[in-house]
From Swiss-Prot:
<keyword id="KW-0862">Zinc</keyword>
<feature type="binding site">
    <location>
        <position position="75"/>
    </location>
    <ligand>
        <name>Zn(2+) 2</name>
    </ligand>
</feature>
<keyword id="KW-0539">Nucleus</keyword>
<feature type="compositionally biased region" description="Low complexity">
    <location>
        <begin position="249"/>
        <end position="270"/>
    </location>
</feature>
<keyword id="KW-0408">Iron</keyword>
<dbReference type="GO" id="GO:0030424">
    <property type="term" value="C:axon"/>
</dbReference>
<dbReference type="Pfam" id="PF13640">
    <property type="entry name" value="2OG-FeII_Oxy_3"/>
</dbReference>
<dbReference type="Pfam" id="PF01753">
    <property type="entry name" value="zf-MYND"/>
</dbReference>
<keyword id="KW-0560">Oxidoreductase</keyword>
<feature type="compositionally biased region" description="Basic and acidic residues">
    <location>
        <begin position="687"/>
        <end position="699"/>
    </location>
</feature>
<dbReference type="GO" id="GO:0031543">
    <property type="term" value="F:peptidyl-proline dioxygenase activity"/>
</dbReference>
<feature type="binding site">
    <location>
        <position position="54"/>
    </location>
    <ligand>
        <name>Zn(2+) 2</name>
    </ligand>
</feature>
<dbReference type="GO" id="GO:0160082">
    <property type="term" value="F:hypoxia-inducible factor-proline dioxygenase activity"/>
</dbReference>
<dbReference type="GO" id="GO:0008270">
    <property type="term" value="F:zinc ion binding"/>
</dbReference>
<dbReference type="GO" id="GO:0031418">
    <property type="term" value="F:L-ascorbic acid binding"/>
</dbReference>
<feature type="binding site">
    <location>
        <position position="42"/>
    </location>
    <ligand>
        <name>Zn(2+) 1</name>
    </ligand>
</feature>
<feature type="binding site">
    <location>
        <position position="489"/>
    </location>
    <ligand>
        <name>Fe cation</name>
    </ligand>
</feature>
Amino acid sequence: MSSAPNDDCEIDKGTPSTASLFTTLMLSQPSSSTAVLQCTYCGSSCTSSQLQTCLFCGTVAYCSKEHQQLDWLTHKMICKSLQTSGMVPSNLMPQAAPAVMAPIPPTVSFDDPALTTSLLLSLQNNPILNQTISNFPPTFSITSKTEPEPSIPIQIPQRISSTSTVPFSSEGSAFKPYRNTHVFNSISSESMSSMCTSHEASLEHMSSASLAMFPTSSTAQSDISRLAQVLSLAGDSPASLALVTTSVPSTASTATIPPPATTTSSATSSGKSETITVGKEKIIQTDDPDIQIIETEGGSKPTVSRTRKRPTPSNSADPKINYKDHNKNVVYSTTLQEHQKHLQNRGLALSIHQAMVLRLRYIAEHVIRSLNEFGWAVVDNFLGSDHYKFTAKEIERLYERGLFSPGQLMEAKHKDEFHIKDIRSDHIYWYDGYDGRAKDAATVRLLISMIDSVIQHFKKRIDHDIGGRSRAMLAIYPGNGTRYVKHVDNPVKDGRCITTIYYCNENWDMATDGGTLRLYPETSMTPMDIDPRADRLVFFWSDRRNPHEVMPVFRHRFAITIWYMDKSERDKALAKGKESDAACASKKENDPTSSSLNSLIGSLLRPRKNPSTHDLSKLDLRLFPSTSSDPALVSAADEDRVDISADFQSTSSLAHPESTDSGVSLSTFNVAHNHMERTTSLQSISDHFRSERSHERRSSTSSDQDLDEGLPPPPSTNPEYYI
């Protein structure tokens, strides 16, 4: 091969293109015996022993490590494109400083059309290559002797016929190699030409002498012609296509350049639909970003329409889900005393009860925003430092009375006892005010009433019409490694829409005690760990948007769970259950072998087993009264109330007798007060909440926005942290 003349080394500024970049990087085969090498960054001539080749692609070389680091910002996009496209040979091993091998492009066989054209498209969309670079030194110059070189086979992907089936795979489909829709969707013909001009100007350092290294055989001319066809399908300009053929010495056979495919882009004024014509196939954009409609036009045949799904990487996230950073979900942690002090500083002298009601409104606003944006919310210091201690004592006292039973599963009838324990090993008790053994659990009743007060403000603020709730489920996880595997609370649409969990575990260490609530939100790429610390209340959607699990527990862990029901979904679930029960009853009646006596004997002889969680939730469901259009919380049962001879207690009744912290206790109660007096005060607070809510419902005429009018802004000194 004759050495390239000097005038050929200076290429026309208007002709370099993706074709020259492709042929220079991938198709040049210089002779290593007479090669004169230069540094890619500074252009200084060096011997092969002084140059350091790129360890990843082997296509560039540098005279020093500093020049390689300075040029990495420019080279890394091409280097990564070569690696991801599979263009780097497998025998390329990292070498510190090759002594004999010159830093020339490795020999690559372009038998795979997908790799060939995907490399072209990746180089065309390279943001670094689209920048105009002036007076950029050449990568390396080559002076070689005249010697024949073998031709490199290039295979061009064939056009898809109208009747062929479109294959799809995660690695690449038949549409991906040479018809990249992202290239044509957002650019017009003018912007395409300007992009090509800018792209061609950025490749001035590529020499046209590299094109003279192609052999002059007819096979090479055919390969170049087919290469030009690929570049035309990839969107290269006609000027750049001419560079591929005119720079090669012509022989008896002349390479012909096929006209570039007609690409037409039209959109309606509203911008909802977009039509792209490539050859005889027309791609119609749809509202769904994953679906396209392709119309193939034939001569006398009718138009054939088909739909196909755009290829997405198998390891990528679901494009339909809007993923968010859930670490930005702030925890509400303002205490009641801090809230009252903030109101007093603003000139609002409110009693402790008024401040508590106002604080519940602020909590509701925080929970509504977090649920609508992230699907879960966390509130700390919900009851207060004294109340949560008595909540834990009451749960432990109920556990010692034998009211708890092992937790069951909805599908427990299909599993053995050991399998159930392996999935769920907690002990639960459905709190019932009619149960005389749980009559002294006054703090639990106060907690339920306060959570109901928060839920009361959800009306017309979320996508569910809350019409009831379940009874409170008191759960204890014994500290012997018990757990609850990953699950969904409501996978079958039984009516539960919001799950609330209250923790009362004092001095909880997540590192040593375990018991973490691990939440898997639908819009989060990573799970969220919520430690069950004392006086923490957690809200999250009960459906498949929030799978969760309880990690192994190594210390007694107390939790109180309440599910709030969507009215329409719950009614449908109950109606479906009644239909199923009626079908089972009619089947038993039609069975001649069954009789009432046999059923009675069978029920007496059948071993009794604990009802499942689903059955208990059906039995213990408390629906809101349906006589009013506004949701009204359940009133306390007669058995839940405590006889109160005196009038409403003072504000000092909020503090427990055992409290010694002056910063928390707001009273001068005598320590000698017994537990019945404390129970009486808590019951009076609960009754006071119900009376205030009833008064608010009577005075309110619209939504919660009326209640928020005239409210002071939330405390600016709210201590916030991230989970």
